[in-house]
Every structure is written in structure tokens, then in C-alpha cells.
Amino acid sequence: MAETILRLQNISKYYYSDTSVTQALRKINLEFSMGEFVAITGESGGGKSTLLNVISGMLPFDEGEMYFRGEPTFQYDDQDWEEYRRNKIGFVFQDYSLINHYTALDNILAALVIQGKDPESSKEEAMAYLEQVGLTEQAAQRASQLSSGQKQRLSIARALAKNTDIIVADEPTGNLDSETGEQIVEILERLSHEKLVIMVTHNYDQAEPYVTRRIRLHDGEVVTDVPVNKRDENVDQDHQNPSEGEIKSNSGEKTKKKHLENFFALKNIKMQKGYTGDGY
């Protein structure tokens, strides 16, 4: 049986304003396992993106507990959540969030450098990620020159380069035509055989042939949680190593910082104090 990697227990989330309090999530109880491709659906304002942002560590939850590989996260401080986002979650955004004046290859190298890898010795690895999404011929093109579908493929390749067990995708096909969108969903399905992929979508008809599970939210509550397409294959155990992505030693952090400085200096980008590469 596939390993449970995430468990949400009675998770609630509130949004506060000067005059009101809105409960965005209401006592959510869910478990997610490796090898799943989960579609989160529901009407606008139902809590889909809030749930995804809580899962990915982008938003704190207010009540309940979220367990990552059996360990509670309620006591995480800012540094713990930063490490979680950086080393545990691969992000695929609707707006791509690429560095537009970088080439496709350099966008992937940036993700590898943030992990402390040397850019020169990582080019072969970066090309391998581009190959997985069918972008080897576009490696030397700037991100700004790519089509919308190619940009989303590049966004997926960048998420792959983080080598995380979890990929979250927020409306990854929202800016794409139906044919290109289906290609993106197909790529995510292929990746989900060795990872957990969680996707928010308004177009469930497009996703239905590919996902293994559908969760539907209404007014912040789970109203549907059903399996869709069963899989019999075993998940690759290489992707179930609890120690992967642990916080590096001080010497490793120094090496990582040096690679970051060198890489971004070459690209004529001034690193802002405190830059951590969240989203990369």
C-alpha cells in the first residue's frame, strides 16, 4: 500500500477583516498518499485554493493539525515553513512564475542552484528535466519567447528540478486552450506515478480521465472525496525516503549561498537580502 505522506486533521482556516471573520476551511480531514493524482474541485470561493495553500505551506492553518510523514507541523516556525516550501513542495502556478529573460535551461538551473548545486555541472541534469516535458529544442529560448503551453511545461520542469515528493498545481491549465491543457494534465498524470500531485481545477471534465481521486469543496467543507481511476502499480520506493530534503549543514548552506551568488551575478541580478527562492 502506498505511503501516506500528508494527513490533515480537523483543519480550519479563517480570514479576518476589520468588520468580519470568514471561515474558509471547516474541519478538513484528508489523507494523501504517494502515487496519487488528486483533483480539487468546487465553485469559486469554496476553499480550493485556500486548501492548496495550506497544504503547500503558503498559508498557516488556524485550527487542527497537518502531519507531514507522520510528524505534526503545528509548531513549525517561519524557518521550518520556509524549509518545507523549499524542499518538500514543487509548485506549478497558473501564471507560470518564470524568469522571463532567462532561457528555459537557465530557469531550471536556477532551481538547481537554489538547492546548492553548481550550475556548470548541473546542465545535463537540467536538460533531463526539460526532456521530460518535451522542451529540449527550446532550451536556449528565453521564457518570454515560449508559447503559453511551453511556459507551463517549463514551470512543471522547474517543479521537477526541486526533486520533491509533492507537486501542487493551482489551475495549471487555466490560461491554455483545451488541447494544450489536456497535454499538461497528461504530463502531471505521468509524474504522479512516483509522486503526490494535487491540482486545483475548474475544468474537471478535462482532468477526469487522468486523476485518481476527486475532492470537491463547498463553503469550505469536503462534500465529495471519491477514487476515480484505480492503479495497480507499485509506487517507486526511491521516492519515499523520509530523509530526502532535510535541512543542510552549515557548510552545505555556505556552498549553496556561494553557488547562488555566482549564478545570479552571471545573470546580472542583484540578490535581495533574505532571498530564499520560494516557488523555485
Predicted regions span which residues?
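The feature captures the beta-strand-to-loop junction immediately N-terminal to the Walker
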Residues: T41-E43
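Helix-to-loop junction immediately C-terminal to a conserved catalytic motif
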Residues: S56
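Conserved ABC transporter NBD signature motif
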Residues: G64-P72
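Conserved signature/switch motifs of ABC ATPase nucleotide-binding domains
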Residues: R86, Q141-S144, K162, H193
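Short coil-to-helix segment of the ABC ATPase nucleotide-binding domain corresponding to the Q-loop/switch region
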Residues: Y102-A110
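Conserved ABC ATPase signature
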Residues: R142-L146, Q150-Q152
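Conserved catalytic loops of ABC-family nucleotide-binding domains
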Residues: I187-M199
